[in-house]
Amino acid sequence: IIIQYEGHKH
């Protein structure tokens, strides 16, 4: 499962 959330952007 891949969880992409707004906040992983450096």
UniProtKB/Swiss-Prot annotation:
State the superkingdom.
Eukaryota
Secretion signal, residue range per the UniProt entry: none
Entry keyword set: Antimicrobial, Immunity, Innate immunity, Secreted
Compartments, record wording: Secreted
GO terms, biological process: defense response to fungus; innate immune response
Q: Where's it mainly located?
A: secreted
* Keyword presence, Secreted: yes
Function as written in the Swiss-Prot or TrEMBL entry:
Exhibits antifungal activity against Candida sp. but does not possess antibacterial activity. Has no hemolytic activity but may have been derived from hemocyanin.
The name on file for this protein is Rondonin
Report the source organism.
Acanthoscurria rondoniae
